[in-house]
């Protein structure tokens, strides 16, 4: 009986433990911290979300919806595989946290003790990064129509900057987060984007971002709901010069009524110039051509790194038909590293994935990407019903498939090597893309101009001539159109025709400094040194801070075939101005200075200038030419340019 009594007692104890209740979660202690940390960036006053989650009443009102969207992992939006990274701001809920929210709702959405609430966040006038040093706003609001498909509008915002600044951070405020879904931001140091904006009746313009508008010195600039890039380290700032415009491509979705959109941008400055410059690598194909109904169309691309790099950030980009993206690195020893995988791509949730700590990849690593598209009626995001053929293009109704990578190299020579080699790869792909765009829009002069510049970049000047001729015919004979055609003709070796085009540009616009400068170059190649010098002097007179004009004039005064045309002391003065303008970081400028010093008999200084130029690792054939000239300086001999007349 004693044994039975003990067994019964143990049974009672065991039964008691089995009935212990797990505490019911409360809002103040368990749910409010989760909401603030994972949802607060969007579900805040003026945030991108359609409603706020700032109070117990807010969260209780949407409690059932929160359970649903967290359980299916639709919210908070984080499309990348959780095993990727770790990335800055990586904030998917864990399974335990999702279950905690469910238990709170099942338990009656208990509020709890107010003393358990986390301290509220306080933004400075809505700026997450603190008070900006400069705030710019679209001068006039844009009116988004009530109905219709998504709208992509390009806004140009001039920057009131009177001196060179260095930027540590940029924060974008959409102005109307209910309808602005994401934005890509670039900088344009020319007036080209502004001219398109001015030509349009309303704020901004429709179409494509020009090639003159680009990301600054290897930095991503953009905005998606809930994402604010942290301030950059002081050694990674980017340069902002006067007369620069911000070019904002905004993706907007009609709400059912007319909406006013007036975005603002806050800039954060530093007095410290960068000591390191990132590179932007873009994997992708511009030959995309997806048949209607195709469910498994695949696009791949890869690149072998010529130098060691540290990967700072990734950004996949595609449109509505894309369903999956994968980025991978294969190390020289064959080891594979998954960079990013998004199994359910959604164009509406683009994101820059910035590593918490840079990912090191050694020289010889192959970086690759793979996109999968579904152009069938089964794809709920397909913008065409019924599906139609989809080709590469920058409009949202077209398709794209890129994986951008921001990387840092170990030193400046490695950066030069990487950017030079990778740019050659990208330019060939860009030619394909622009030819596709021109097929669809044959009368777009901007497309013809951009395609022509790409043909020049890949060493196919006759292709450039054809596109510039078409642009000239469309523009009706403007000075820039004649100038562009003259440039392509000169590269193609058609010098007499080039001279004619440059002279027509100058006749239309006598103050066209670049036309005078390029005309001088062609005349010099024809052996007409005196005429060339006159054109170079006109170019410098019209644009005294033009490094190109100063360098060309200094070069001919230092190296002219005939001694009577050489003026060494003036050449030295001009070359020193060029070197100062380029902060001693331009190998060609230093080469000109070396030639000028040698012409003046200062051979030690000439050798030093050549050595400094070579340390910048210039591309061939410039590097070989500098070495040959340096050998002359060691022998106490100046460099004298060959006389074109002697080669005829």
Write out the residue ranges for each language-model feature.
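Aromatic- and Gly/Pro-enriched helix-to-coil junctions and flexible linker segments
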Residues: 17-165, 173, 243-249, 254-256
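His-enriched metal-coordination microenvironments in redox/metal-binding proteins
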Residues: 128-410
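Structural marker of alpha-solenoid helical repeat scaffolds
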Residues: 440, 474, 508, 542, ...
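Conserved alpha-helical positions within TPR/SEL1-like repeat arrays
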Residues: 446-457, 480-491, 514-525, 548-555, ...
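Canonical positions in the second alpha-helix
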Residues: 437, 470-471, 504-505, 538-539, ...
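Glycine-centered coil turns and helix-coil junctions that link the paired helices
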Residues: 170, 553, 557-564, 636-637
């Amino acid at each position: 009986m004693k044994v039975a009594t003990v067994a019964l007692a143990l049974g009672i104890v065991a039964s008691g433990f089995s009935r212990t209740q797990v505490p019911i979660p409360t809002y103040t202690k368990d749910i409010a911290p989760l909401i603030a940390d994972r949802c607060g960036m969007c579900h805040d006053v003026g945030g991108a979300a359609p409603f706020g989650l700032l109070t117990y009443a807010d969260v209780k009102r949407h409690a059932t919806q929160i359970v649903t969207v967290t359980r299916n992992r639709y919210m908070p939006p984080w499309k990348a595989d959780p095993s990727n990274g770790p990335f800055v701001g990586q904030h998917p809920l864990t399974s335990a946290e999702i279950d905690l929210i469910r238990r709170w709702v099942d338990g009656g959405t208990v509020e709890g003790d107010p003393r358990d609430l986390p301290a509220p966040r306080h933004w400075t006038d809505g700026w997450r990064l603190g008070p900006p040093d400069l705030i710019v706003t679209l001068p006039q609001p844009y009116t988004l129509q009530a109905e219709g498909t998504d709208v992509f509008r390009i806004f140009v915002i001039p920057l009131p900057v009177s001196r060179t600044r260095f930027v540590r951070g940029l924060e974008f405020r959409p102005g109307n987060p209910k309808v602005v879904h994401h934005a890509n931001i670039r900088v344009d140091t020319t007036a080209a984007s502004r001219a398109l904006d001015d030509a349009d009746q309303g704020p901004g313009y429709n179409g494509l971002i020009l090639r003159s508008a680009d990301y600054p010195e290897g930095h991503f600039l953009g905005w998606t709901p809930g994402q604010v890039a942290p301030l950059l380290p002081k050694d990674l700032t980017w340069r902002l010069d006067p007369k620069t415009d911000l070019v904002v491509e905004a993706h907007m979705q009609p709400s059912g009524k007319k909406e006013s959109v007036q975005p603002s941008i806050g800039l954060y400055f530093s007095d410290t110039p960068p000591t390191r410059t990132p590179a932007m690598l873009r994997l992708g194909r511009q030959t995309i051509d997806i048949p209607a109904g195709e469910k498994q169309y695949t696009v791949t691309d890869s690149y072998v790194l010529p130098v060691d790099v540290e990967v700072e950030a990734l950004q996949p980009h595609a449109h509505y038909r894309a369903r999956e993206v994968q980025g991978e690195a294969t190390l020289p020893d064959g080891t594979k590293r998954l960079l990013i995988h998004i199994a359910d791509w959604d164009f509406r949730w683009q994101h820059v994935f910035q590593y918490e700590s840079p990912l090191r990849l050694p020289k010889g690593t192959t970086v690759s990407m793979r996109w999968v598209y579904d152009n069938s009626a089964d794809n709920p995001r397909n913008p065409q019903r019924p599906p139609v053929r989809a080709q590469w293009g920058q409009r949202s109704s077209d398709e794209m498939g890129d994986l951008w990578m921001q990387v840092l190299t170990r030193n400046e020579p490695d950066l030069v090597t990487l950017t030079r080699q990778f740019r050659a790869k990208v330019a060939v792909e860009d030619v394909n893309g622009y030819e596709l765009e021109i097929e669809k829009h044959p009368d777009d002069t901007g497309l013809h101009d951009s395609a022509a510049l790409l043909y020049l970049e890949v060493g196919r000047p006759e292709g450039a001539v054809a596109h510039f001729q078409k642009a000239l015919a469309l523009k009706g004979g403007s000075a820039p159109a004649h100038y562009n055609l003259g440039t392509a003709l000169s590269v193609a070796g058609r010098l007499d025709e080039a001279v004619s085009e440059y002279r027509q540009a100058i006749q239309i616009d006598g103050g066209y400094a670049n036309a005078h400068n390029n005309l001088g170059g062609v005349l010099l190649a024809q052996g007409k040194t005196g005429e060339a010098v006159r054109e170079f002097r006109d170019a410098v007179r019209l644009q005294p801070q033009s490094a190109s004009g100063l360098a060309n004039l200094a070069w001919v005064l230092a190296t002219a075939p005939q001694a009577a045309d050489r003026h060494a002391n003036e050449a030295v003065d001009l070359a020193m101005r060029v070197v100062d303008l380029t902060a001693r970081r331009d190998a060609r400028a230093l080469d000109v200075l070396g030639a000028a010093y040698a012409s003046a008999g200062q051979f030690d200084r000439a050798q030093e200038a050549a050595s400094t130029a070579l340390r910048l690792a210039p591309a061939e054939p410039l590097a070989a030419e500098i070495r040959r000239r340096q050998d002359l300086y060691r022998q106490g001999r100046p460099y004298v340019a060959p006389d074109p007349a002697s080669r005829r």
